[in-house]
Amino acid sequence: MLNGLKIQAEKLGYDITFINTCFENRKMSYYEHCRYRNFEGVVIVCANFDDPDVTELMNSEIPVVTIDYVHHNCTAVTSNNIQGMEDLVKYIYSQGHRKIAYIHGQEGSSVTRDRLASFYRTIDELGLEIPDTYVRSADYLETKGSAKQTKELLNLEDPPTCIIYPDDTSLIGGRNVIIEMGLRIPRDISVAGYDGTMISQLLYPKLTTIR
């Protein structure tokens, strides 16, 4: 998606500058930084939309487009998270899995709400009974939380046979734990991600991920 954004922006004569929202010890807010750099517009993707600095930027006079988040003052581009999750769960089911766990992103996010609702609706349609311990929360685009939740899932008395992650970065955190525990993918445990980023296709074995 970011590559597509860059290509289209360059066709229109714009340059793209990336700002890492995980950068600590910032001396300026995002809004101040954008004003200082004279940005003509901002696209916000994979950010913590509860961050006051992000909210300040969205409420400013600078044109802002949000990805997979709806804010009253911004143009929003959203993916079909409901259909995507349904397709992913049904594919996992078709591979023979009946014990499917889901590590979802932050509570309160519209993306999380859509995906979680679709997950529950789809497993109901398939006649599956998923225990509450199989559904857990971890931050988007972060490996530590997904690693912790993966370890807890695999240490359950009746662990899942497949774990869905909220994005490919989180999936890598889970994958690392699986390897550390001496398990093999997909022989001992299957995993699935969300995003279809290039990195997920560079790993071996190739990871199941939805675009």
Regions found by a protein language model. Name each.
Residues 3-50:
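Central regulatory/effector-binding core of bacterial HTH transcription factors
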Residues 3-14, 41, 58-66, 70-211:
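Bacterial carbohydrate/catabolite-sensing allosteric modules
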Residues 49-51, 170-171:
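Glycine-rich nucleotide phosphate-binding loop and flanking beta-alpha elements
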Residues 50-59:
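Active-site-adjacent beta->alpha loops and helix N-cap segments on the catalytic face
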